[in-house]
Amino acid sequence: MNLLSRFSHRALFSTLCLSAASWIGINTAHAQISTLRTGKLPNGLTYYISKDAGGSQGTAHFYLLQNVGALLENDQQQGLAHFLEHMAFNSTKHYPQGVMTWLRQRGLYDFDARTGQDETRFSISEVPTAAPGLTDSVMMVLRDWCDGVNITDKDTEKERGIVIEEWRQRNSVSKRLSDSIASVVYNNSQYAARNVIGPLRSLETLTAKDVQRFYRTWYRPDLQCVVIVGDIDPEVYEAKVKAMFGSIKKPKKAEVRANFTIADNTTPLYYRFVDAENQSHSYGLYQRVATPTSLQGQAATKEFLFQQLFNDIAPKYFAYLRNDNR
């Protein structure tokens, strides 16, 4: 755990003010919930579409959320979920030259993707809405990500070098620490066995067919969600989503998407980490908190914000006490 060396009451006050401002913003968003369009297509794909009355004048933001992450990998597939995320920016059905190339050629640089243990998220933001053809094309990128990624041997070899270099850059003391303590933090669950990027041996040996198999198994409409927010007419974009994404086929025999949990330990767990490159002494205290499943809407939002606020303030305050209130 990294602790700040200094902490002041003013810093605490500023943090509280910022968090309160975020809270007010969320409540304001709930007051405008009438603009939200949500639904589920017959193939199982979920969508959320809303007009942003605030800071998105003239632009829109597009997201594709996959209920697919590293936890769904078997022992021979470790690292595939993250590798597939990289592959999605290469050749696709409607963008054979590569999605990343197409986006940059049109001045769209605010795009990103992230793979976690539970999910994978893609985003293309700050898309001008004055040209409907551009937003339609961006929606087609999301559509291709759903089931139209071209996973070729050539692209696989190119991304292999990129991902292996990413693995090497991450192979730091902090990464080795997080991997080492995972067994106690996650109580030897599947979360402890999947660190997203995967082991080097897997990255060196995976094939295009391996990636294709994972893609065809898990990237499917019942595990996908499209989110569009911005200076848009939600009714118009809802019709576009239905027309564009409704044709995605749901597999007749789909693999069951398992839900993974972390069992409570009966006594506190402890791990001592020693590394030759570690230049500092530190300690960490972890408390697992169950995600509330019964909360919905505003109550769920407030609970989420409270946890984020606590996680932000607590380490700073402990650092403040450690440094004799300086």
PLM regions and their residue ranges:
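An aromatic/glycine/proline-enriched structural segment found at the starts
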Residues: 225-283
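M16/insulysin-pitrilysin zinc metalloprotease superfamily fold
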Residues: 91, 124-159
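M16/MPP (pitrilysin/insulinase) zinc-metallopeptidase core fold and M16-derived inactive scaffolds
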Residues: 60-128, 176, 193-199, 312-326
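Scaffold signal of the M16-like zinc-metallopeptidase fold and its non-catalytic homologs
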Residues: 90-92, 111, 138-141, 145, ...
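Boundary at the C-terminal end of the N-terminal hydrophobic targeting segment
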Residues: 29-31
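Acidic/histidine-enriched alpha-helical segments
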Residues: 100-101, 149-168, 233, 252-266, ...
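N-terminal secretory signal peptides that target proteins for export/translocation
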Residues: 1-9
